[in-house]
Structure formats: structure tokens, C-alpha cells
Amino acid sequence: LALGFSEEELDSIVPISKMRKLVEERTEATPDNRFYKLNPKVDDIPEKYGRTCNGVKLLVLGTVETANSGCVCPEHVMLKRIINNLVLHRDDVVILDMEAGLEHLGRGTTEGMDYFVVVIEPGARSVQTYKNVKRLAEGLGIHQVHVVANKVRDEKDEAFIREKIPAEDLLGMVHYNEQVIDADRQGCSPYDFSQKAVSEIRGIKEKIDKTNM
């Protein structure tokens, strides 16, 4: 929704991980076949299944939800190959919006990325998550791990963030904003609702450009 897609457009998108026939076709995995390709063809998938809005192509990968599937299953192999193809074999800017948590790091799904932006809130558990993400990311060879503090309400929150996050890692803060909440309730992009939030995010983007040079 933040990109400008309508709810109807988003509801019509089927995540790649849910496209069972596609996964079986590319990996040659079936319920009766425990052996499958570890290097399925994926280079055509972004063009075939991506949706474009405002100059941004959105590809919904989905998650692997099979119980006890472990780290290696046909769906996971497929998703990891798609990400690797986008990151390593194309001259595009790729932004991965990952679910909160550490699972994607444990599976190595984000290996090959140049830059991590960890979105936290003013709280001890959120700060600890950032520390864990940074440690695991460095284990994957990713040393650019930075923080955006979200839903910052007041000076106490600001002081907490500045105390807990090293200045060189902090990209900026996005303050709690009722206009952004209203936009979310209406299923609209906050871009058209709050110039303050847009200004804060632009400042973060400019800092990313500087730290990623």
C-alpha cells in the first residue's frame, strides 16, 4: 500500500512460495520425488510475476510455512535463488522487505546484500533484536548494518535511542504520526498524508546514500 498499489491489486497477487505448480515445474519436486534441483531457472520470474507501480517493481516472494521443513525445501531453494539472481546478476537496486525476526538470517536468505536497515522502536527488546541482527549479518559478510527508529513519541524516546544506538549506525528517526496511522487505516500511501513523515524519510534516504558510497 505504501508504494501506491490498491488493496484490490495486492489481494490479487499470489506469492511465489504459494505457486505450487511453478515451484514443482522449476525444481522438479513432487510429493513422490524427494530429490529436486538446487539451481532452478528463475531469471524470468521478476518480469513474469512482478507488478509495477510508480516506477517500482514489486515481487512478492512469500514465506515457507511447511511445518518441520527445515532450511532446505523446494520453496526455500526457489526463493533463495530468486533473491540471489536479483542481487548478484542484475544491475538493479533491490530492496528486500523482510518479516520481523531473525529467521531469514539463520537461513542465509539475505546473503549477498550490501546494506541492512533495521527498523526498531524505542524499547529494550527492539534494541536487542538490532544487536542480534547485526551479529548475524556480520557473519554473512554484511557490515553495513544501520538503524531507523520508528514510532518515536517524545524527547525521552529520542534520548533512549541515542543512548542505545551508536551514532554512526543511526540513520534517523520517524516520529509517531497520527496522519500516518490514518493513512494506514484507509489503505492509502502515507506519502499523500504527512509531509513531516515524508521529510523524515527523505533525510534517512539521503543518509543511506552517503553511508553506502
Give the ranges of each region predicted by the language model.
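Conserved nucleotide-binding/hydrolysis micro-motifs of P-loop NTPases
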Residues: 64-66, 100-101, 123-125, 152-155, ...
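Switch II (G3) loop of P-loop NTPases
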Residues: 61-67, 71-72, 83-105
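Anionic-ligand binding region
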Residues: 98, 112-116, 127-133
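N-terminal phosphate/diphosphate-binding loop that engages ATP/GTP or pyrophosphate donors
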Residues: 1-54
